[in-house]
């Protein structure tokens, strides 16, 4: 559906009427042959180019191209792809899927495959403005129902304006366009394995609604998503980033091309078992006890509801238990893994020895163990309280 009101043209995905032009640009990109060969290894580049040029709507692009790309990623890098909770959502309703965030692209992209496999509509997807660079990325992203989200920066006034604009777009999309949305629970990926919802995200959701704060959240139909990877995407890159942050004051500054490197690494790196848990929607009855709370406390409580869902339904793997035992120096969870699995994880841990000339390897290893062990701490916290 296309809207005459153009106030969201700066962030919205493409309309169907813009797809043909986008496909022409994609087909002529110098990166096209390599992408086509990966997604469609059994076809020639010319055949795929002809197919791309015939696409003139979002649905066909998502089903014929992006769904096939997801299937290839699963085939090449995932040993077991599972999901749960589809019975908790109604295909006729729109939801705001709030997900933990472990991989720049795959957290949202692989969820679309789950939905497509069961004839659910795909979602619109938030995509950081820092990533929406280069014509190919813009065309693929906006043809795939991605919309741009500005990262924090600039003046407080500018950030407020951008947050209000995003909030208005999210509510309009759910209410008027009748489209679901995927958004991460926080700004940027979780680097330390601790999945927590940013209270600022909850505040942003509310900015587009002037009335009752309970109603402002309940009508969004929030559905938490817990995605877990046996092998954490870009885990070594995350370790190095955390290490640098620990040893330098101020905020970590990414190098040119670092986000693209993380995207590509996340796609091709072996991921082992991957599970998506679609959690129970947040309902108004759960929100009502918070109705009289001050605004900041209300936001904290709503974020806590989302965290409880995500951490409780996060599926743990042997790597989590191995890392926890190694970090604690005991064998509390030894029944959850085999000697072979522990050996494989230990070999992966040893790969950090390559950085011995520039870093404290023992600290690097402790950071990596924390990334894998922290989901156990989180699950224990929320299931015992």
What does each model-found stretch correspond to?
Residues 2, 18, 28, 47, ...:
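Glutamate identity and glutamate-enriched acidic tracts
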Residues 230-238, 242-257, 261-346:
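Long, C-terminal catalytic modules of enzymes
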Residues 1-95, 101-112, 116, 138, ...:
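Membrane-anchoring hydrophobic helices of lipid-metabolizing enzymes
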Residues 66-70, 75-282, 354-355:
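Soluble catalytic domains of membrane acyltransferases
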Residues 56, 60, 153, 157-160, ...:
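Charge-dense, low-complexity intrinsically disordered segments
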Residues 16-17, 58, 152, 199-212, ...:
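General structural signal for secondary-structure boundaries
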